């Protein structure tokens, strides 16, 4: 059984001995553990959980340096230094006893996540995971996919989540603001129903646009769709009546549907087979985040007549 770890994990820009060159990677996590000597092998073994490490290389001072094989990082380096064994002799009832030998392990991890935009959120979770001292091979934290992502897959998924959040916002906008627009335009509930029905016709248009993606490239069509949807939605802020608003939202909703479809297709293409369900789940969460941000517009939409237009720009 491992001896209790010292409560001395540190996180900061750098924690290297004086005179030693500062490492360019950021951030840095430093852990100090006192463990049983019998458990030392686990610390000298490359990690195979959230990251797959290369076989260690011994530094001049005996420190083991582990590099990156695969993981959601642009940079990763883990250094493990083991101090001399300590053997403690005590007495129990006047009889000398010899305790299990322990060693001091200092682990320094330098990493740079390949997670744009959402990096701070995952950096916080990663630091907590690294400080836990867990060395069970293949044991993944609850917040990570069951299969290791490489830097490209992590970057692509992060950017798709950003686009998904925008798509969730744009796709929810008309249903959350139509009541306020109808009040300003003195439109009846029948007019509102007609507008919402016409907006849903845009789904048919989206199928035509998605078919173009196979010839023109999915990423180019995805970016064009998200930009086009945002621009057309902004035109809705100038609407003098329900017809203008309904027309702009019909095309905007069509492009938003294109965004949702292409995000799903690209995610399936880019993610490893063991992480596709994870990718779908986080994409759904970020789309819900965007929809929730749209609902937040209700806080000011009825402050004044026409205040709902702010949500469109």
Where in this protein do the model-derived segments appear?
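Helix-to-loop junctions at the C-terminal end of transmembrane segments
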Residues: 205-218
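Extracytoplasmic
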Residues: 161-187
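Glycine-rich segments within core transmembrane alpha-helices of 12-TM secondary carriers
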Residues: 275-303
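Structural signature of the two symmetry-related core transmembrane helices
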Residues: 220-235
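Helix-breaking motifs and short loop linkers at transmembrane-helix boundaries and internal kinks
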Residues: 186, 217, 238-244, 272
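Helix-loop junctions at membrane interfaces in 12-TM secondary transporters
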Residues: 237-248, 304-306
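Cytoplasmic helix-loop-helix junction between adjacent transmembrane helices
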Residues: 248-283
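Short hydrophobic/small-residue motifs within alpha-helical transmembrane segments
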Residues: 199-201, 289
């Amino acid at each position: 059984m491992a001896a209790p770890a010292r409560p001395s994990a540190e996180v900061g820009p750098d924690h290297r001995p004086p005179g030693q060159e500062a490492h360019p990677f950021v951030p840095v996590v430093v852990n100090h553990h006192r463990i049983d000597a019998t458990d030392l092998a686990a610390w000298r073994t490359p990690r195979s959980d959230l990251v797959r490490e290369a076989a260690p290389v011994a530094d001049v001072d005996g420190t083991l340096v582990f590099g990156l094989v695969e993981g959601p990082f642009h940079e990763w380096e883990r250094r493990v230094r083991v101090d001399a064994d300590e053997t403690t002799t005590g007495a129990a009832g006047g009889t000398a006893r010899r305790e299990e030998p322990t060693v001091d392990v200092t682990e320094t991890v330098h990493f740079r996540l390949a997670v744009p935009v959402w990096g701070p959120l995952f950096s916080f979770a990663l630091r907590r995971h690294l400080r836990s001292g867990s060395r069970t091979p293949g044991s993944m934290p609850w917040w990570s996919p069951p299969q290791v992502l490489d830097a490209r897959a992590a970057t692509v998924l992060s950017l798709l989540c950003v686009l998904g959040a925008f798509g969730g916002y744009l796709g929810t906008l008309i249903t959350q603001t139509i009541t306020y627009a109808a009040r300003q335009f003195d439109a009846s509930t029948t007019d509102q129903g007609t507008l919402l029905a016409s907006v849903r016709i845009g789904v048919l248009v989206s199928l035509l646009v998605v078919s173009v993606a196979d010839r023109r490239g999915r990423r180019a069509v995805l970016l064009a769709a998200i930009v086009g949807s945002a621009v057309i939605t902004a035109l809705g802020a100038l609407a003098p009546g329900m017809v203008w608003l309904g027309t702009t939202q019909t095309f905007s909703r069509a492009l938003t549907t294109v965004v949702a479809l292409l995000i799903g297709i690209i995610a399936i293409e880019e993610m490893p087979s063991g992480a596709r369900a994870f990718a779908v789940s986080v994409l759904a969460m970020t789309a819900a985040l965007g929809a929730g941000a749209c609902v937040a517009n209700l806080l000011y939409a009825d402050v004044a007549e026409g205040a709902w237009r702010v949500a469109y720009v």
